[in-house]
Amino acid sequence: MRILSVTAQKPCSTGSGVYLTEVVKALAKEGHTQTVLAGIARGEQMDMPDGVKAYPVYFESEGLPYPVVGMSDEMPYISTRYKDMTEEMTVQFRNAFLAVLDEVIEREDPELILCHHLYYLTALVRERYPEKKVYGFCHNTDLRQMKTVSYT
């Protein structure tokens, strides 16, 4: 099976990133074709297991000129909290991730999409590709962050 794993955060840098990487490794051992789409800082690389295709979305770049988004108030790297994003930042995020997502879907044609965190990117993936099987992983930090947002 062709499987795409998606996260807006750096893989391997946080608990959810380590979880994503371990799921990718386990599924690769089962013979599945793996692709990962992830947000990273410009100038960084995605270190994925052998045979796994990596599609980075670069933060701190012209199209996405702020640090990688994070699901916790304090991340192990410089980050942007979702609740601090402006409307302009949200549009930049959407455009940058959908451009790479469209490329991945066209090139890799995943049969299954695994999205990490029940937040904005998972919603974008589901909305853009309603015909695809999309599963969302909740790592609990997303629920905690939702409680801190003012909905007035």
Which residues are covered by each model-predicted region?
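Active-site proximal beta-strand in glycosyltransferases
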Residues: L112-C115, V125-Q145
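N-terminal subdomain of nucleotide-sugar transferases
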Residues: M1-Y58, E108
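A conserved catalytic-core segment of Leloir-type glycosyltransferases
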Residues: G39-R107
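Short, flexible loop segments at the rims of nucleotide/cofactor-binding pockets, characterized by
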Residues: C12-S13, E88-F93, L143-V149
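Short N-terminal targeting/anchoring amphipathic segment
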Residues: L101-Y119
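Conserved small/polar residues in nucleotide/adenosyl-binding loops
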Residues: T152
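Short, well-ordered alpha-helical microsegments
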Residues: G43-Q45, Y120-L124
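Short amphipathic alpha-helical segments
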Residues: M48-P49, V125-E127, V149
